[in-house]
Amino acid sequence: YKWNETKKEVILLNKEDDEKVQIKRIVTFFKTIGVENIGPGLYKKMYLAGFDTIYKIINIKKEDLLKLDGIKEKSSQKIFSSLHNIIDKEIEIEKIITGTCILDSIGYKILKKITEKYPKLFEEDIEINLEQLIEIPSIQEKTANKILGKLSEIREFLKIHNQFKFKTIKLENVNDVLNIVITGKRDKSIKEFIDA
């Protein structure tokens, strides 16, 4: 490990080689895109059985699940359904990118601002520079540099995982953009309705 620039946090070196980090990234990815009813323990079982990448898990078959320790027919069906209820539908590209952890501390809201201005930036080989990203509200130079540095890695991930269908929102004009404020408890169904 090493200290970060501010000397306040420790950064793990060789993240790609650390089993715990890889399992946590897999769990984070599927949780971020909305897969339910599958916990960290099950993802760990998949990982240890050789389904150690997002690609392998999204392509897992019911028969493969039955080979996992403690998984019977009913459980394999439930797991398979939980995965495919999400991955077979359109998913917001921002959720996919956030879930990959490629951009570490850059989340959904920042990515959403970018895709509103440049909808195909992450899918296609579109040229973009630092100044164009900084023009977007809330994006500072450090964030823009991080995005530019990881852009090819994100595009490569999306090419490899081409079975994902991206949800796109097309606005007719700028007046269609609404600012919605929710007070009190944030109900998941209300948030999904607003996002849809």
Write out the residue ranges for each language-model feature.
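DNA strand-break repair and replication-stress modules
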Residues: 22-25, 38, 49, 69, ...
